[in-house]
Amino acid sequence: MFVEMSVCDSPNKNSKLDKKSLTPFKKVRRKNWKQEAAYKSDTSKGQEVSYVGERFIPNRFERENIEFNLKYIGKRKERDILETGVTLTASYWRQSGFISNINRTFGIGERRLFQFSSQQGTRSRVVDNDSADSDWPCNPRARPYAIQNATHEMPGICSPVDYNMMDWSSGGMVAMSSGQDVMLWRNLDESTMVFSVESPTSLKYSPDGKHLAIGCMDRNYPVLDLWEVRSPTEFLVSYRKLFFKSMGYISCIEWSHDGKEVICGTQCGVIIVLAMPTLNTLMQLREHRHTVKKMKFAPTHKYFASSDTDGKIFIFDAVLKVRLLKLDGRSIVFDWHPWTGEDLAVAERSPASIFIFNIPRRQFVASYRRRDDRIVIKTLTYSKITGELLVNVIRRDDADLAVCEILVLASLNRVVDLMSHQDRGTLFLMWNPDGTKIATGGLDDTFSLWNFFPTYKREAILRKQEQKAKDKCSSLSLYKGIR
């Protein structure tokens, strides 16, 4: 499935393949450079060394390779994004801040400070500096906002991390389970409520936060319980669905965007679509042959993706539930881009590999691939506000100790932030509903909350979007009135 590509490279970044990546000029040697070099060689013998007035003749390169030399075309060699750490991250923020301040001070709209051509008859326009060098649509933050603001003790939270056993509802309720009971609390700042559930295997809140679906066991039979959230402290089991014993257990749960369907992935690989609120079976999808590990709808409601423990990903039509394509890999994790709904970020845990797959084109548009097992990818997820890709990695340091950190990528060759803790490490758990906060776990059984994006900036973005929608509606109304 995956095409062999060089590390830290994407198809549109290879200067030897993409002629547009070359500079608009061509270096040409002087015609008599050989005579100058020979004269310099002859006259230098037997003379005293002088440091005044001497002419420096640089080393020569083969003419056919001169255009592809990184030194001449002005491109820095791409570095390994999973091993850069604080060094590259700090340099990015310094460079980004310097460029933005210079442009703001002098009113520069173009990326280059100097333009050696006539500007008469042309209008200056602001150009997206990163559009030509991005592997997906992204608007990275102006500076690193991600800081820890709360830490709680929670034994067993990272042994191991199961993303199907935790969720954060739109109503602010957090549900988690370590396989024994289900713990519920509101906004991480109130007392925890513990409910006794027999062998919970998965859980998921509805989009409106009014229902909580819990997969559990009743003796040897898999069961789906539907809890109605009546208040922050009151829950009612409104419906229960009993499955055949051959299904094994409910491994993961997903809701449709309108909350009218509940999709259950099972141990045997069957995906069951249920209707709300009676939980009647609408259809069964039998593409997988192994335990279904993750299911997720695209944000545009057009596609539905599912993956299993064997590394296979199936893409379905979100409405008809018809299989569109299949991807093969090894121990795969994935996430949809929050804006396009067509770009699927796919990662293989080891050797660490990241691929950006475009569904309509049915091809990989960018890739990163390691050739060793030193780094393992735990999971990856997009920020729905900025479009940045968060990659949770586990690696060994010089003392052979496990280091867990979250790399924030604006592209497959650009690290823009690093979320880490020197002592306990950082394991990604989940986003809060509006995408401004991140919950993480530590190797010392701690639960931490990070501010990823300022709330006031998020509110400003929402107000701007609402204003644009109102302006668009008013323009359409005016157009209809004219007609």
Curated annotation (Swiss-Prot):
Keywords carried by this UniProt record: Cytoplasm, Developmental protein, Differentiation, Meiosis, Oogenesis, Repeat, Ubl conjugation, WD repeat
Gene Ontology CC, one term: anaphase-promoting complex
Gene3D superfamilies assigned: YVTN repeat-like/Quinoprotein amine dehydrogenase
GO molecular function, one term: anaphase-promoting complex binding
Signal peptide start-end: none
Tissue: Highly expressed in ovaries. Expressed in nurse cells from stage 6 to stage 12 egg chambers. As oocyte matures, it is transferred from the nurse cells to the oocyte.
Induction pattern: Transcription is activated by grauzone (grau), which binds to its promoter region.
WD repeats: 158-195, 196-237, 245-284, 287-326, 421-460
Protein location: Cytoplasm
Modifications made to the protein after synthesis: Probably ubiquitinated: degraded following egg activation by the anaphase promoting complex/cyclosome (APC/C).
Functional note: Female meiosis-specific activator of the anaphase promoting complex/cyclosome (APC/C). Required for the completion of meiosis in oocytes. Activates the ubiquitin ligase activity and substrate specificity of APC/C and triggers the sequential degradation of mitotic cyclins in meiosis. Promotes the ubiquitination and degradation of CycA early in meiosis I and the degradation of CycB and CycB3 after egg activation. Promotes degradation of mtrm at the oocyte-to-embryo transition.
Similarity-based family: Belongs to the WD repeat CORT family.
PANTHER family per UniProt: CELL DIVISION CYCLE 20 CDC20 FIZZY -RELATED (PTHR19918), PROTEIN CORTEX (PTHR19918:SF52)
Protein name as catalogued: Protein cortex
Organism of this sequence: Drosophila melanogaster (Fruit fly)
Name of the gene this protein is made from: cort
